[in-house]
Each structure stands twice: as C-alpha cells, then as structure tokens.
C-alpha cells in the first residue's frame, strides 16, 4: 500500500516542494523514516502514532516506511507531522489519496491538535510557484500563508478537521485574504519628545531620506539612543514587496509575532554589544538569519559601538556594500538579504567626556586613541553621516514649546523618496544609498560651483574613493530634500559637514600621540 503527499520545506529564505511517500508492507511492525530527516523530524513518528490512536484512526500493524524527497536535502523541524499523518491514513485507504495540487504543513500534538510552525510564508510562496492551489496549515499560520494570493489556504485546528475535509464530510472554510494597506498612524516614540539636537535631527532626516548609515558620537545622556529609537517614525512606509521580503525572513527564523501575518512597519533591531559574530551575521550548524538580515529593509542600531567585538564589527563591511550575506556551514549554504540602515552610537572615550564643555575627561590620550581605534577605518568609511550629539543647554531643555513631530519630518522624507523612486524606476535601486557607480555618474549632476567645492574637499580631507562616492550620495539626498534636480554647493557643503567627525576625533588623537 502506497501514498504520496505534497509538503514543503525551507532552506535559507526560500521554500521548496517536498514529497512525503508512505509505503506499508508486510512484516513485523516497525516505523522507518528516510530522506535526511533531523532529530525533530524523526520524533514525528511518536507524535503521529499518538495522534492517530487518540483520534480513533487505524495504525498499521506492519512495516511502515516514510521517505521525504528530495532525499539529498536535510529536512528540519516538526512541520512534516501532518503530511506523514495524512500519508499513513491514505496508504491504508482510510481517507482518499490527496490530490497533487494539495499540500499539507503542521506540527501535531499528541491529541491531534495542530500547532503553528515557522516559515509558513516562504513555504506558501514556494507552493504557489510549484502549482499547488490548496494549502492546509494550522489555524495560527493561515493569515500568514494567505499572503500568497493564488493559494486557497485552509486553516485547521486539528488533524480531524483535515480528515473530514478530505473525506467530504465537513469542508473547511478558506482563510480570508485582506488587501495590503499602509501601516497607519505611527504609535511609537515621536521626535516631538526630543529637545534641542538640531544637527542630529537633521542628520537622521537625511539618513532616512536616502537610506544612509549614520554614526552618532557624544557623551552619556545626550540623547543618542533616544534619537535612534525615533528613526523608524520618519522612515517611509514599506511597499508590498518589501513587506513580503521582510516577513519571509522573520517567518523563516521563527520570529514573526503571533497574529501578525505581514510586517508593515520597518524593523528596528538593537542587539546587545555582547552578541557574537554568528548572532550578528547568522549561522548555526544549519544556517539561520542573524540580526543584519532581521534588520533587512529597516534599521540596525548598535549602541556603544566600540564595545562590540572586532570580528562582529568587521563582519558588517561586506553586507553594507552588497546588501546580502552568504552563510556556509556544515548543514548547508544560504544567502540572506541584508539591506539595512546601520545606526551606530558611541561615547568619544571610555569615561565618555572627552571634549565635553564642562566636565573633565579622566582618560589618557592613549586610552582615548585605543578606544576610538576599535572602530576600524574601513567601517568608519562606510558611515555616510557622522554627527556629534553634544549636551543640551538648559534653555533648550526647559523650553516648553513643542518640537517638530515625526509626522512633519516624515512628509519631507516621503517626498524625497518619491523623487528617488521616479528617478530610478526600472533600475532595481530604491534609494540614493544603493546607487551603483554607473548610476552615481548618471544622476548626481553637480553645478560648477559644487564641483569645485567637492574637488577641494577631496584633496583637503584626503577622501578615499568610497568616501567620495558616499559623500556624493548624501549630497544627492540633501538636494532631493530641497527639491533640486542638480546638486548645488550648499548641498555639497552640508554633506561635507557630516563627514568631519573622523577629523575631529580619530585624526586628532592620532596626531597628539
């Protein structure tokens, strides 16, 4: 007796079809599972056996072989419980053989209840691509799987519901599908709460408008973390494609919040400085996404940047340039998207008061230099904007007048991003920070005065080729915020102003030593 059931798996970020073949033959009772299952998959035999008996269904008193094809790809997780369950019953002709256009996913409880799984969205999209039209999933995963528009998704709370549906006794109702709409009003921290710090606020606005990286340097308590946490409130809304891509990553990692089928707000990730390189970039024996991939299309905030390990910080360099990261491990190889905005915050020295207007720094020049040099030149070079966050004067702190709100700043950011979307339509680029050298040359047109100013800055500041390109991208964003198609001297001057911290701190301490 033989049955085959369609299921799915996930490798990296992408789903793939899996055929669950069940063969019941003569011989002593035994259950064997082949096809590179991991320990969680192997354990499904006991869950399936208990579920079948507790639902008063027959368990074969003979040899049962289950094959998960393709057999050369390792299968992980408990999501194959339901298809194995269906396969055993279908092989005994207790229920009809499922059709090739039907697929099944779900973990079983011992009483036959269905429990949610990770990776429902990438697997649903893979099922749709493979020609599957009906997908049976645990009820908690139904809204997420229903994002795949060409699938009919059937939510089930128990394997008994699936049996009755296949037997034609009681049909399951398809999951409702709601159209994609905007995230709505921002309910998180607002820029109106911030007192003073006009330069830092402007830097965050420019960073949001162009998708640029930003480094904030200042003494403790001046609002660096407060400012960073308000950055998502001024970022443009995600498109449907961006929302799906972001949700796929969180779903595959098992981090999608319960009851949230699609992430609509841009992600803000803030890992602790004790995080390992594998935790930051991704890893494990079987590759899993790390913080830089979980921050895709959003913000990665690294507070107390010099406290991170050197390998962790240096691992950011390639993803910041390429927007993807490839992880190779014994359990496989996976490529994850990692197009994120990096926001770093740090003190200027170990005690935090180097250069403070009123408090004396207790660090020696050697300590200051060693502390600052934890940030390597190549990583500092990738910070498009560098801004100082000084102490706020009392008059500004006590000012009761409301500051500019996030909604007002966001309107300007949205207008600048709309200009960029129209300009780069059909190129695959969505913001200025992702401009390729060819597009940079084509779209970053300088006035003669701006060109002379940039040439002087290039020589005087000793900019690298990468720094030059990044400065030009920032100037392009500032011009977009001003509604100017050409980049003028004022736009270049402001972009240069946001590249001065390395001269103030890193180069000065090096000379003093």
Describe these PLM feature segments:
Residues 34-45, 60, 67-77, 286-287, ...:
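Basic, amphipathic alpha-helical bundle interface domains used for macromolecular binding and assembly
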Residues 1-215, 219-225, 467-468, 485-513:
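Peripheral, non-AAA+ core regions of ATP-driven protein-machinery
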Residues 168-206, 210, 237-292:
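P-loop NTPase nucleotide-binding/switch module
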Residues 297, 303-304, 315:
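Walker B catalytic acidic pair
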Residues 215-257, 322:
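Walker A/P-loop
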Residues 18-24, 280, 384-387:
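Short beta-strand elements
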Residues 33, 216, 231, 302, ...:
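Hydrophobic anchor at the beta1->P-loop junction of P-loop NTPases
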